[in-house]
């Protein structure tokens, strides 16, 4: 999305750090450490001076040059802008110039409402302009009262009906848009659901009821990013945190097994890290495994996820015959011959498999376990490791 050179405004002799935004997840901690070397990049302060900025898709962001920003604000803005299509980026660029915005907070606020303006960059194509304008009004909830959509006539009504403001990106028509504060300067708003996100939560200090003081977190992520989110939310330790579930890519069986009133944020993150490479079939299989094993916490589910290859799953098989049919036709363990389909005894094979295995039918199909440990032993987490993780999550005296 963009690259920015960030420097310490008070100590420019320390040099600048060039950061790619949004910051790749595997380089986030490295980036924070690099900023710390020039004594910027703290969690709560706007201590990064934007010395330079380059963006092909969003040149209006250069208006932030020489302004102060927080590194996580810049990262949030980049993620938000990545979700915009080509015309939406044009709207954002033009609106930023139209309203004279230059601070990162103003840009963050604009990202929520820039879709409400209409931008005409080509007056030779009024048909397309009219269609765009009509769709824009649908976004604002104020569509024109008209019959069948006629693009050119709609564009002509727009041009004649309200003043346009010339920018380098085109002529901007406000459509009554008002810039409203969505960011309070501390608590980052909810952002676009990232492609790699498996679970989204809100975290707040114990007893806090003002939802504006909660932080949104998307898992999996780095531990340092979680710790910074805790600081923004005023959470000093894991024991003083409340978790609110927003959504996940996991199956209902997994979500229902988690008691978010008592879960550890870091254990949930470890679970999501363990499932980061899962495909849809893996999530479905894990749901079936959870129905069979009945885990009661994120740590147990993580153990199941990490040992998913010790389970066999026949999706949608709910009878011995369906199980036998799946194994012979779809499991790839046998060379199935379509010409002999009437000669296979699926029911007998399914019954035989049931008698030989430690398996059961669940809502999603048939699931069996072939590991050497009992399920209780498999799900048992290392108590010493859990204790160490909780100690590492203490926030007192943290530098960031």
Regions of interest found by a model, annotated:
Residues 28-102, 224-296:
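Structured domain cores in non-transmembrane regions
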Residues 112-122, 135:
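Extended, low-hydrophobicity segments enriched in charged/polar residues
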Residues 11-15, 57-60, 179-181, 207-214, ...:
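Short, surface-exposed beta-strand/loop "edge" segments at domain boundaries and coil↔beta transitions
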Residues 124-210, 214, 321, 325-373:
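Extended, well-ordered protein cores
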Residues 103, 116, 290-304, 310-311:
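Elongated scaffolding segments in large macromolecular assemblies
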Residues 374-390:
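Eukaryotic nuclear/nucleolar intrinsically disordered, charge-dense low-complexity regions
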Residues 150, 345, 385-400:
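Non-Sec secretion/translocation targeting segments of pathogen effectors
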Residues 1-43, 195-235:
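N-terminal ordered "arm"
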């Amino acid at each position: 999305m963009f690259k920015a050179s960030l420097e310490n405004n008070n100590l420019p002799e320390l040099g600048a750090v060039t950061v790619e935004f949004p910051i790749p997840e595997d380089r986030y901690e490295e980036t924070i450490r690099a900023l710390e070397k020039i004594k910027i990049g703290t969690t709560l302060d706007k201590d990064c001076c934007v010395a330079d900025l380059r963006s092909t898709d969003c040149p209006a962001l250069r208006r932030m040059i020489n302004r102060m920003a927080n590194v996580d604000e810049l990262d949030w803005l980049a993620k938000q802008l990545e979700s915009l299509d080509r015309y939406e980026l044009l709207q954002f660029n033009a609106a930023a110039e139209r309203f004279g915005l230059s601070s990162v907070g103003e840009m963050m606020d604009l990202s929520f409402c820039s879709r409400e303006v209409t931008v005409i960059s080509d007056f030779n194509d009024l048909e397309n302009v009219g269609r765009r304008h009509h769709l824009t009004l649908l976004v604002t909830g104020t569509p024109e009262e008209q019959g069948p959509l006629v693009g050119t006539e709609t564009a002509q009504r727009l041009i004649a009906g309200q003043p346009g403001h010339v920018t380098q990106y085109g002529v901007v028509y406000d459509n009554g848009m008002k810039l409203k504060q969505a960011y309070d300067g501390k608590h980052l708003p909810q952002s676009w659901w990232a492609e790699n996100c498996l679970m989204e939560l809100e975290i707040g200090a114990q007893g806090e009821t003002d939802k504006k003081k909660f932080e949104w977190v998307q898992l999996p992520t780095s531990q340092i990013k979680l710790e910074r989110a805790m600081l923004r939310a005023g959470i000093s330790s894991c024991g003083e945190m409340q978790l609110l579930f927003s959504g996940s890519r996991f199956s209902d069986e997994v979500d229902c097994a988690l008691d978010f009133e008592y879960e550890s944020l870091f254990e949930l993150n470890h679970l999501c890290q363990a499932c980061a490479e899962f495909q849809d079939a893996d999530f479905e299989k894990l749901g079936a495994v959870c129905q069979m094993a009945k885990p009661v916490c994120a740590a147990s589910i993580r153990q199941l996820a990490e040992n998913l290859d010790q389970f066999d799953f026949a999706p949608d098989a709910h009878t011995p015959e369906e199980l036998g049919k799946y194994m012979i036709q779809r499991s790839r363990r046998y060379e199935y011959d379509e010409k002999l389909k009437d000669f296979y005894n699926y029911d007998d094979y399914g019954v035989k498999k049931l008698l030989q295995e430690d398996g059961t039918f669940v809502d999603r199909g048939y699931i069996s376990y072939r590991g050497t440990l009992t399920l209780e032993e498999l799900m048992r987490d290392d108590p010493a490791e859990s204790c160490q993780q909780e100690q590492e999550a203490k926030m007192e005296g943290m530098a960031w």
